[in-house]
């Protein structure tokens, strides 16, 4: 599980859905949550939180400027590639953050991913969890 530090910016509510904006690594990320009284208690602007997401929730691209229907992204440097027959574990660095992605080996081969290469990690808003 990846865990990054973030700060609550604000949130919007529609019915039982909350869209929370957090500041993370000099960008604004969007997190979708199911509304609850306990969730709203955590959403005070300026509050420090952790954003969590699974290694398998990351999509990777070689170009950060491609049009994609995913709002949250981090441009990273590849630190390490651990190959398996079907899946690879890729360790990425973004400033002081280390992020782990699990992706198909075929994708790693197609992208020719090697340590030192720049990649963009994309994470959907509904794949994120907030932790206080």
Region annotations inferred by a language model:
Residues 11-17, 81-87:
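Short, conserved beta-turn/loop elements at beta-strand boundaries and strand-helix junctions
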Residues 90-104, 123-130:
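Hydrophobic transmembrane alpha-helix bundles
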Residues 14, 34-35, 84, 105:
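Residue-level structural signal for beta-strand termini and adjacent loop
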Residues 2-5, 10, 28, 36-80, ...:
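Glycine/charge-rich catalytic "coupling/switch" loops of P-loop NTPases
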Residues 15, 24-26, 53, 85, ...:
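A generic beta-sheet turn/junction motif
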Residues 19-25, 32-33, 89-95, 102:
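Short, acidic/hydrophobic/Gly-rich beta-strand patch recurrent on exposed beta strands
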